[in-house]
């Protein structure tokens, strides 16, 4: 499949996309890639394990951290009669969730008694999970003092430096997880090398323009947790999957590219750099009908019952 735009059209589309809010690109990614079904399948497996391991009448409680509009909200709410809390620094994402909840009447459980309420919290996950004391304060201030049965980091650890992961995961594990509960994290694999992969795209452009090196290796982090036994009583599992993204609209395609390149939250590409990225993506991917390929790692940390 060959797609064509004039140079002026494609550069204008690339610059427009670079100005959009990240939650817009997040919606495009979750709607038009196979990421949502991939995470959904893994998430349902985690939930099944939780139901098997916990007492039968347990009303599960879940906390989704930094995942913007949380495309897995219907799964979480159906499974968690004790409620779902969405924590994000993005106020636009919070408003989007509130609108969806109101429209679908999820918070009032009109779909049936098995559906729990949805709450939103605006906070910086790096601050509220910086250490056990901060995490305990979050639990008492926003989670009614209750520990959670599931905490998710779905593509949200991108926005924390790798050096912060150990403290954030440890604080979550010790202060937010109930016995028998689990953490489910998902992140782009740091080791994929194919030319159409999001990993290679990031290495090429964030590396060339900012000297960035992707040290956010979730699989290696999980292996280190398991090897060091850093979380007492933890069962650590790692899996890797492949997802694809494509869209006939070049502006939408470029919006997802900017999200992957962490523009402008982490790396602010200049207009000239934006044009260079746009031209490369047009020539090597979109005009040829090549989808973006993402290898992504899943980390599941379960706190054994004690």
Model feature map: region roles:
Residues 180-213:
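Conserved class I S-adenosyl-L-methionine
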Residues 212-230:
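Short alpha-helix
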Residues 61-134:
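Class I SAM-dependent methyltransferase SAM/SAH-binding core
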Residues 68, 229, 233-306:
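Conserved Class I S-adenosyl-L-methionine
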Residues 152:
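A conserved beta-strand element that flanks and buttresses the S-adenosyl-L-methionine
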Residues 159-172:
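A short, conserved alpha-helix within the catalytic core of class I
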Residues 155-156:
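Short catalytic micro-motifs in class I SAM-dependent methyltransferases
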Residues 1-59:
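Class I SAM-dependent methyltransferase Rossmann-like catalytic core
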